[in-house]
Swiss-Prot record:
It is an enzyme of class 2 (transferase). Gene3D superfamilies: 3.30.420.40, 3.40.367.20. It catalyses: D-glucose + ATP = D-glucose 6-phosphate + ADP + H(+). Its main location: cytoplasm. Its EC number is 2.7.1.2. This is Glucokinase. Keywords: ATP-binding, Cytoplasm, Glycolysis, Kinase, Nucleotide-binding, Transferase.
């Protein structure tokens, strides 16, 4: 929302990535220049306005007129009720309370998708494929606490991020083992989405299924425990769970690539994959990604990148704000 759209080149701009646990704030002091990043625990502030004011005081920022917040929520209107924290607020009332000319909110994964367009090559690790086709659609998928899914389509005004809830599409099992895991999940949940498996909790669910099948102990493990034991070769069952997780990610990523025609590349965000880069390069991900019968050659050409940048949500919020101010 903007009350005086004429002076839209002003810096610094306030950008934030707000989750259920922490709110990350920063200042964009020039195009694509992010400074003074700070992480504030959400629980220490009664309202989002209180957290913003605390950051502005802490950073010594003055003259901030424009802001964009990426938030772990769908943005469906002026009223925002966070699903994983108690903050609830009106965007317009918050803008007025902070004395801003502009305040826009966007879904956090939409922001991560936009950040892809500003990510330098040093913050990307390629896993197979050839060179991306310039201006072709890009697919963005991010397993973490949940499963974020987006896409980027080029327009005369620049890159447009597709806001959706693709992580909640139905998961398609590939082989007999995945059918068994899918059935185990189906017995626990009414609908088995891709996110049920391609998330931290999903990795635990895959392990739980394998442990139940083999009557192995421990019956359950945390995602970090599974990853650690798998990478340190301490548990064949954990390694199997991680292999299946990566194969499933290959299936879902290739489905998204085919749906979007993502010859501009597939970009993997989220907190899980960057913790196992060496393993991931040779994991079942890439072979499963290309295993699409008649479209194997089509997918073999598509590059996949692991995004390694530290604060993609903040960079994406800055990109969204820049796009907004260009067009008001």
């Amino acid at each position: 929302m903007s009350s005086t759209p004429n002076k839209h080149a002003d810096y610094p701009r306030l950008v934030a990535d707000i989750g259920g646990t922490n709110a990350r704030f920063a200042l964009e002091t020039a195009p694509c220049v992010i400074e003074k990043v700070a992480v504030l625990p959400c629980k220490e502030y009664d309202t989002v306005t209180d957290a913003v004011r605390a950051y502005l005081n802490q950073s010594g920022a003055t003259g901030v007129r424009h802001a964009a917040f990426a938030i772990a929520n769908p943005i469906l209107g002026d009223w925002v009720q966070m699903t994983n924290h108690h903050w609830a607020f009106s965007i317009e009332t918050t803008r007025q309370a902070l004395g801003l000319d502009t305040l826009i909110l966007l879904n956090d994964f939409t922001a991560q998708a936009l950040a892809v367009t500003q990510t330098s090559s040093k913050d990307l690790m390629q896993v197979g494929g050839q060179k991306p086709v310039e201006f072709a659609p890009k697919a963005v998928i991010g397993p973490g606490t949940g499963l974020g899914v987006s896409g980027l389509v080029h327009s005369p005004a620049g890159w447009v991020a597709l806001a959706g809830e693709g992580g909640h599409t139905s998961f398609p099992p590939f082989d007999d083992m995945e059918v068994l895991i899918w059935q185990y999940a189906k017995n626990k949940y009414r609908h088995v989405s891709a996110e049920r498996f391609l998330s931290g909790a999903g990795l635990s669910l895959i392990y739980e299924t394998l442990a139940a099948k083999q009557k192995a102990e421990p019956a359950k493990l945390m995602p970090s425990e599974i990853t650690e034991k798998a990478l340190n070769c301490e548990s064949p069952l954990c390694r199997q769970a991680l292999d299946i997780f990566c194969a499933m990610l290959g299936t879902v990523a290739s489905n998204l690539a085919l749906t979007l025609g993502a010859r501009g590349g597939v970009y993997l965000c989220g907190g899980i994959i960057p913790r196992m880069l060496d393993y991931f390069k040779t994991s079942p991900f890439r072979s499963r990604f290309e295993n699409k019968g008649r479209f194997e050659a089509y997918l073999a050409a598509i590059p996949v990148y692991v995004v390694l940048s530290e604060f993609p949500g903040i960079a994406g919020a800055a990109a969204a704000l820049g796009n907004h101010l260009k067009n008001v």
